[in-house]
UniProtKB/Swiss-Prot annotation:
Keywords: Ribonucleoprotein, Ribosomal protein. It comes from the Bacteria. This is Large ribosomal subunit protein bL19. This protein is located at the 30S-50S ribosomal subunit interface and may play a role in the structure and function of the aminoacyl-tRNA binding site. The keyword Ribosomal protein applies. One of its GO terms (cellular component) is cytosolic large ribosomal subunit. The lineage of its organism: Bacteria, Bacillati, Mycoplasmatota, Mollicutes, Entomoplasmatales. GO terms for molecular function: structural constituent of ribosome. SUPFAM superfamilies: Translation proteins SH3-like domain. InterPro entries: Ribosomal_bL19, Ribosomal_bL19_CS, Ribosomal_bL19_sf, Translation_prot_SH3-like_sf. NCBIfam families: rplS_bact.
Length: 128
């Protein structure tokens, strides 16, 4: 017979698994992604796109989040997105990059051509 603590733990995990998204693509640091975010203005919602380089992924399960960095009007902007949040509408991969680190904070100090990341070109198997 299951104890009361076990039943509450099971129900907690059932609620969390209900809230997990299953439409997220598989991406890592160095990839360029496009995140569509729902913005509430008054009574209406609109979609705002944030496209940039993934410099960090963190957490697992419901706490999975990603830090995306982009150039906006000559200033670099970094934004953290909890990916299982209801304000995230869609995440798409623009291009894949090859880096040797999980957290590419060193990209903050680089500028110009030094800040480029080697692109991984899709193969025929990836297109299928």
């Amino acid at each position: 017979m299951a104890s009361k603590a076990t039943k509450t733990t099971q129900s907690k995990y059932a609620i969390i698994n209900n809230q997990l998204r299953n439409d997220l693509p598989d991406f890592t640091s160095g990839d360029t992604i496009k995140v569509d975010v729902k913005i509430k203005e008054g009574e209406k919602f609109r979609i705002q796109t944030f496209e940039g380089l993934v410099i960090k992924t963190q957490g697992s399960g419901i706490t999975y989040s990603v830090v995306v960095r982009k150039l906006s009007n000559g200033v670099f902007v970094e934004r953290t997105f909890p990916l299982h949040s209801p304000i995230i509408d869609k995440v798409t991969i623009v291009k894949r990059g090859r880096v040797r680190r999980a957290r590419i904070y060193y990209i903050r100090k680089l500028s110009g051509k030094a800040a480029r990341i080697k692109e991984i070109l899709p193969t025929k198997a990836d297109k299928k």
